[in-house]
């Protein structure tokens, strides 16, 4: 098969039919990404391919480092063309890596350039693409609109004033840009900045934070504020997690000691995190939001690189906490007793957790359709094999037709072809089930499932259009 042909990843006739007739043209809701609200609002043109393609993309940075490229041409102040040339040389060696496929797919879909990126073609592609980047069709909002994206959910700190979201809500009519709340600094209470962060949260919420109860009250005010601007999700990174009973625990003392930068015991930290997550579950339930939990990841494990370059620069790895599903089971058992389990999507960076998590969510579904979901293959699992394995586990342990599907988790405006990539994997997976006689060769039945996973489920699950739908 030709590289990136119209049928790439589609290995049977049913897969081809399902993709081209039922998946390809469905709109996109990107419910978890790391685009900056300011960049969407300001809608500035990018000067060149390096700025739009390599800036902030730690997936690509990891490959560049593996190819011996100096940091000056990765995150440093090197010349933009030299950075792109270094990437082109690296991409030649990335055969078999999904970045090779994504990058060429993005080049083909956005720039209509059907050439292989290499050191020989770099200058030609650079010049041709940069000419297009100078046009209005390559401003951020046009890229979103022309990708048939209906909703973009950014990732925002509770203290964010969401000023650009407010402006976009008034001005942008072709798609929604909605905030998703991620209170990292309330979780990272041992990083030495907890006191300053509580001061900031107090100021923006208008609530004086003097103990755990008032801290949660301030957080609730931010849930209300985010809701007023269309917010429907929270997101939480738990690199590791150990459940701890919180009854009769002096949480106020733990907070005070963290503010004073005193050392907390592991038990105290686990008690605080458990209490915090339970309160966050309660708030998600109250506001009819969806809680996302990203677990089992080792972040910024290269200390010198962290100090020199900073966070989110490509020095993270898969976590190996073997009992994290067991600890989450204790958390959900406690939440069930309190009747505070919200809609939840669970992601783990370690595939060994997926089957355990899939069986866990089956124990706590509650009322409503697929209230708990096993999240799409995340980060290092964002590959054809990773996507297929997640689909297989979801289908075998729950109801695949209820799955809310793909997200980009990206910092790039050119990443939307990842939805196409996922849909191709989905259609091929389902096509194989038909070919092997495991599900009916019924286009109406199976085609609807493909359309639902591609768009309809995520539309209904999060309720981004609830007000508009109720008026129809």
Curated annotation (Swiss-Prot):
Among its keywords, does the record have Protein biosynthesis?
A: no
Protein name, per record:
Uronate isomerase
Q: Which residues cross the membrane?
A: none
Reaction catalysis annotation: D-glucuronate = D-fructuronate; aldehydo-D-galacturonate = keto-D-tagaturonate
Q: Does the keyword DNA damage apply?
A: no
SUPFAM superfamilies from the UniProt entry: Metallo-dependent hydrolases
**Family matches, as PANTHER family:** URONATE ISOMERASE
Mind telling me which Pfam families this protein's record contains? UxaC
Per the UniProt record, the source organism is Lactococcus lactis subsp. cremoris (strain SK11)
* A single MF term (Gene Ontology): glucuronate isomerase activity
Organism lineage string: Bacteria, Bacillati, Bacillota, Bacilli, Lactobacillales
Q: Which gene encodes it?
A: uxaC
Q: What biological process terms from GO does the record include? A: D-galacturonate catabolic process; D-glucuronate catabolic process
């Amino acid at each position: 098969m030709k590289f990136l042909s119209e049928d790439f990843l589609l290995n049977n006739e049913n897969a081809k039919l399902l993709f081209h007739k039922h998946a390809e043209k469905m709109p996109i809701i990107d419910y978890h990404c790391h685009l900056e609200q300011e960049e969407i609002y300001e809608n500035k043109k990018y000067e060149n391919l390096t700025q739009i393609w390599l800036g902030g993309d730690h997936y690509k940075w990891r490959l560049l480092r593996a190819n011996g490229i100096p940091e000056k041409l990765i995150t440093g102040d090197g010349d933009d063309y030299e950075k792109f040339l270094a990437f082109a040389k690296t991409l030649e060696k990335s055969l078999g890596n999904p970045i090779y496929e994504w990058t060429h797919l993005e080049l083909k879909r956005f720039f209509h350039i059907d050439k292989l990126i290499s050191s020989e073609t770099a200058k030609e592609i650079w010049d041709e693409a940069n000419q297009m980047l100078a046009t209005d069709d390559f401003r951020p909002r046009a890229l979103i609109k022309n990708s048939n994206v209906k909703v973009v959910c950014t990732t925002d700190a509770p203290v964010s004033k969401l000023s650009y979201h407010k402006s976009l809500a008034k001005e942008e009519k072709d798609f929604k840009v909605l905030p998703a709340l991620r209170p990292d600094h309330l979780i990272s209470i041992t990083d030495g900045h907890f006191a300053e962060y509580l001061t900031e949260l107090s100021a923006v919420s208008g609530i004086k934070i003097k103990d755990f109860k008032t801290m949660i009250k301030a957080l609730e005010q931010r849930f209300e504020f985010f809701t007023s601007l269309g917010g429907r999700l929270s997101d939480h990174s738990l690199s590791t997690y150990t459940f701890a009973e919180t009854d009769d625990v002096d949480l106020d003392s733990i907070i005070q000691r963290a503010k004073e930068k005193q050392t907390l015991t592991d038990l105290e930290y686990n008690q605080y995190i458990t209490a915090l997550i339970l309160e966050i579950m309660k708030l998600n339930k109250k506001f009819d939001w969806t809680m996302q939990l990203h677990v089992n990841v080792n972040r910024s494990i290269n200390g010198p690189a962290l100090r020199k370059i900073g966070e989110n620069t490509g020095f993270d790895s898969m976590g190996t906490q073997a009992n994290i599903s067991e600890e989450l089971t204790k958390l959900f058992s406690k939440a069930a007793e309190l009747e505070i389990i919200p809609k939840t999507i669970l992601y783990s960076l370690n595939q060994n957790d997926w089957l355990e998590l899939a069986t866990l969510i089956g124990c706590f579904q509650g009322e409503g359709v697929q209230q708990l979901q096993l999240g799409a293959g995340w980060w290092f699992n964002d590959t054809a094999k990773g996507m297929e394995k997640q689909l297989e586990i979801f289908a075998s342990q729950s109801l695949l037709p209820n799955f809310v599907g793909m997200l980009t988790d990206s910092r790039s405006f050119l990443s939307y072809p990842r939805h196409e990539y996922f849909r191709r994997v989905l259609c091929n997976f389902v096509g194989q089930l038909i070919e092997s006689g495991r599900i009916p060769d019924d286009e109406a039945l199976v085609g609807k499932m493909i359309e639902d996973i591609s768009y309809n489920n995520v539309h209904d699950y999060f309720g981004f259009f609830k007000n508009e739908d109720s008026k129809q």
